[in-house]
Amino acid sequence: MRIILLGAPGAGKGTQAKFIMEAFEIPQISTGDMLRAAVKAGSPLGVKVKDIMASGQLVSDDIIIDLVKERISKPDCANGFLFDGFPRTIPQAEALTESGVEIEHVMEIHVDDEEIVARLSGRRVHEASGRIYHVTHNPPKTEGVDDITGEPLVQRDDDQEDTVRNRLSIYHDQTEPLVEYYQKQEAENPGTVKFTRIAGVGPLAEIKDKVLSALGK
């Protein structure tokens, strides 16, 4: 199964990605991981990427697509793969299509913005241990302090409401055109790529069942 998984930060995409990887025995592929691996491996493409990144430039879509094609030719992709965070833009999606990489299913884990803001801005963290609380859904026994150590909890910068809303705005700007692109592909070429939107709210097990059912498991 060759899957593209879309979802705003805080929608629970990472959790569902793990379930999909286990169910289909496929690797999760992100462009960041690919870039780092290529540089580390020292392949001709990796050397080119290293030079570009060292000069502070953005890696072009052409090189990203070459990296993708190189990565999905590896044995662990024999059963398929799960793209996470790629493609991010219409040009990347078009380049992926033109390069002959076939995608079977595009899935978006959809959660309303206000729910995501509530989820993320309510998180509190005990930095030393990594324990995570939520002011509403999983509060500490005593407000503002870790249950075990009694040390203060903090709100990460990434979880500040303004930051969350900014990240959501960027996601919508990038992803809504992608959703339309793949919906159009499905309408114009039935049987090639399927697009599904799954509501990412409710019990985790129910969301997992909806995701795997939509993918044919």
Swiss-Prot record:
EC primary class: transferase
Residues noted as binding ATP in the record, renumbered to the chain: 10-15, 123, 132-133, 202
The keyword Transferase belongs to this UniProt entry's keyword annotation: yes
Region called NMP, residue ranges: 30-59
GO cellular component, one term: cytoplasm
Keyword Lipid biosynthesis: no
Subcellular location: Cytoplasm
Function of the protein: Catalyzes the reversible transfer of the terminal phosphate group between ATP and AMP. Plays an important role in cellular energy homeostasis and in adenine nucleotide metabolism.
Recorded domain comment: Consists of three domains, a large central CORE domain and two small peripheral domains, NMPbind and LID, which undergo movements during catalysis. The LID domain closes over the site of phosphoryl transfer upon ATP binding. Assembling and dissambling the active center during each catalytic cycle provides an effective means to prevent ATP hydrolysis.
SUBUNIT field: Monomer.
Family: Belongs to the adenylate kinase family.
Matching InterPro entries: Adenyl_kin_sub, Adenylat/UMP-CMP_kin, Adenylat_kinase_CS, Adenylate_kinase_lid-dom, P-loop_NTPase
Pathway per the UniProt entry: Purine metabolism; AMP biosynthesis via salvage pathway; AMP from ADP: step 1/1
Positions of the UniProt region annotated as LID: 122-159
HAMAP family associated with the record: Adenylate_kinase_Adk (MF_00235)
NCBIfam families referenced in this protein's UniProt entry, alphabetically: adk (TIGR01351), PRK00279.1-1 (NF001379), PRK00279.1-2 (NF001380), PRK00279.1-3 (NF001381), PRK14527.1 (NF011100)
Residue stretches in coiled coil: none
GO molecular function: adenylate kinase activity; ATP binding
GO BP: AMP salvage
Any Pfam family the entry gives: ADK
Catalytic activity: AMP + ATP = 2 ADP
Enzyme nomenclature, EC number: 2.7.4.3
Residues annotated as binding AMP: 31, 36, 57-59, 85-88, 92, 156, 167
Keywords: ATP-binding, Cytoplasm, Kinase, Nucleotide biosynthesis, Nucleotide-binding, Transferase
Name of protein: Adenylate kinase
